[in-house]
Amino acid sequence: MKTKQPMVPIGYIQFIASLLVILVHCGRLAENSGLHFLLKSLLCSLAVPFFLLLNGYFFQKSTCSWQQWCKRQLKLYLRWSIVYLPLGWFYLGQQNLADSLRVIGLATGFFTVGVWYHLWYFPAVLFGMWLVRKTRFLGYRRQFLLAISLYVIGCLETYSSYLSGPLLVFYQNYRTLFFTTRNGLFYGFLFLLCGFCLGEHQKRPFFTKHLGRKLAVSLCLLGIEGRLVYLNQGDDKNFMLFFVPTTLFFLAWLIKQQPPKRTWQAKQAAEASRLIFLSHPLFLETGKVFFSLAGFPLFFYTIALTGAFLGLRKVGSRLNSYTVGFAKKTVDEKKSV
C-alpha cells in the first residue's frame, strides 16, 4: 500500500523564505567562518532565486495581461519606494553627497538597484520578465542558452578572486559603473525563465520524475561549488551556478505536493511573506542603529517587530471592514424608513 505523501503548501515555504531574507540582512550569523558562510551564502541565498522562480511560474499561470501585471508590480514598487525614500536620503547624506547628487542617486537607484537595499528585486523582476517575453520568439533552447550565458557573466561577481588579466579589468570597470551584476539582465532573467518554463511544462517527465534524486544531486554540487567559493571568496556571493537547478527542482517537487485547493492558512502565509519581505528593513535598521544588534539577536528582534506590525495591520483591516459594513448598513436602514 502506497504511503500518502504530506502536502506542503507553497505559501508556507514562501513564509520561511521571507524569514531567510531577514536573516541574510542581519550581518554575521556565527563566529565560525564556515558555519557563517553555510548559513548566509548558501542557505539564505536560496530564498531570492526561489521567489524569482515563483514569480515566473505564477506569471505563466496568470490570466492577467502583461500590462495588468506590470501595473500591479509598479504600484507596489512605487508605494514602498516612497516609504524607504527617507532612509535612502539619509544614507546618501552619510556619504557626504550634496543634495543634488542625492537626488540623482535616488532617481538612478529607483530604475536600477532600488532606493533601499532590498528593493532591487522589483527592477530585476520587471526587466527580467520583459526579457522573458521579448525573447520568446527564440524558443526555449536559445532562450536558455542566452539566459545561462548572461548568468555566467553575472557569476564574475562571485568568482572575482579567480579572475585575472582583461577579464578582471572588464569586471572591475563594470562594477565601478553598475555596482553589482545582481539585476534583471544577469540574475533575474534565468530564474524567471525557469519558472515560466516550469509553469508551461510542469507535467513533463523532466519536472515530475526522480525529483528527489535531482534535488539531492543539485544540493551536493551546490555544496562543492560553495566550498570552492568559500576557499577564495569574491566581491559578493549572490551568484552560484547550482542555485539554479537546486531551486528549480525544489519548486517542481513542491508543486507536486500541492493540495487540490489552496487553504486559507496558505493564502495568509503567502501574504505575510510578501509583507515581511517589504517591511522588515524598517524594523531591522532600528535594531542596528539604536541597540547595536547583529546576527541572531537582530533576527529575532526584527521578527518580533515585523510580527507586531502584521498583527496591527490585520486588526486595522478588520476594524475598517467592520466600520464600512456598519456605515453601509446604517445608510440602508435610513433609506428603508
Residue positions per predicted region:
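Alpha-helical transmembrane segments and their immediate juxtamembrane cytosolic regions
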Residues: 1-337
